[in-house]
């Protein structure tokens, strides 16, 4: 497993401690998904290019990230649990830093659910998307049977001792709808502090569908995000439109050693950095 020299940790650790860049290191595990949500940032669907990030590389970079000063890990996609070894990978990552993994919550049954059992003892939370308190409105944006599968899966994970967060992505919601949604997540074993409500970001498929609010470098906080296509400014950065990955928020094509994109991001925020000769960055 790789480590970083302590001398390279300085500017990145300082930027993290000053809240100049986010303390969570993000990984896009993959881009394919069993759903095709209307507002998806990455145009994910069953038949898209998978763009899987090598699991061993994720562990190596997470170890380097810990030495650089990052304090937690985020794993997103696509649907991360379509990566066959994801439960075991989350175990490896959580040995290094606390982990949150974002999921649509529809794949937790049978053998996969059983493979999640050891993670109940780890610093791991599964953040599951649930947008509405009733099936018709929820499934309109996320797909048939999504609501049923999610409300069945959440208590199963809670029973395993796994921390669950619920993320609701909403273009709008009235007070009554929000109250009903909160009653639902409480009944599933998820407290108010673990309910995240966010707006639709107009990138990816949401841009094509005309949904949400525009978001670029001025609207998105800097959080180092690693994908198979490079390192990005934010987990909202490596979005896909018409099958092509957006590069307006690309920090570096190089992702290893992690100090390279981490220092580039810190430099962009503080105004002290410059791109290397082989870097492909936004301007």
Regions found by a protein language model. Give the residues of each.
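Conserved alpha-helical substructure of the radical SAM core
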Residues: 2-77, 81-95
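Hydrophobic residues in well-ordered beta-strands that form the structural core
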Residues: 39-41, 101-103, 166
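Short, flexible helix/strand-to-coil boundary loops that buttress conserved ligand/catalytic motifs
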Residues: 41, 142, 236
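Canonical radical SAM enzyme core domain
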Residues: 47-60, 80-120, 130-136, 143-149, ...
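Conserved C-terminal portion of the radical SAM core fold
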Residues: 68-73, 96, 100, 124-127, ...
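A polyampholytic, Gly/Pro-enriched intrinsically disordered region
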Residues: 120-126, 151, 213-223
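Short acidic, glycine/proline-rich loop/turn micro-motifs
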Residues: 137-140, 208
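Accessory C-terminal segments flanking Radical SAM cores
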Residues: 201-283
């Amino acid at each position: 497993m790789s480590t970083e020299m302590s001398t390279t940790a300085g500017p990145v650790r300082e930027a993290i401690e000053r809240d100049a860049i986010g303390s969570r290191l993000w990984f896009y595990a993959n881009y394919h998904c069993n759903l095709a949500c209307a507002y998806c940032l990455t145009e994910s669907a069953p038949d898209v290019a998978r763009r899987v990030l090598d699991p061993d590389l994720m562990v190596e970079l997470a170890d380097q990230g810990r030495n650089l000063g990052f304090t937690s890990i985020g794993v997103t996609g696509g649907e991360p649990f379509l990566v066959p070894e994801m439960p075991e990978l989350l175990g490896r990552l959580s040995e290094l830093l606390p982990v949150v993994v974002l999921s649509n919550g529809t794949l937790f049954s049978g053998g996969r659910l059983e493979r999640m059992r050891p993670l109940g003892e780890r610093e791991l939370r599964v953040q599951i998307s649930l947008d509405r308190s009733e099936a018709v409105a929820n499934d309109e944006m996320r797909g048939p049977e999504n609501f049923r599968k999610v409300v069945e899966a959440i208590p199963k994970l809670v029973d395993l001792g796994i921390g669950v967060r619920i993320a609701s992505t909403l273009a709008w919601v009235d007070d009554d709808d929000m109250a009903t949604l909160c009653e639902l997540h409480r009944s599933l074993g998820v407290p108010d502090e673990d309910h995240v409500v966010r707006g639709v970001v107009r990138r990816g498929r949401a841009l094509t569908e005309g949904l949400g609010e525009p978001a670029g470098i001025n609207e998105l906080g800097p959080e180092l995000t690693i994908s198979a296509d490079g390192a990005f400014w934010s987990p909202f950065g490596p979005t896909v439109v018409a099958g092509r990955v957006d590069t307006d928020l690309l920090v570096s094509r190089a992702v290893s050693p992690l100090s390279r994109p981490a220092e580039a991001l810190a430099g962009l925020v503080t105004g002290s950095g410059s791109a290397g000769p082989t870097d492909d960055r936004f301007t």
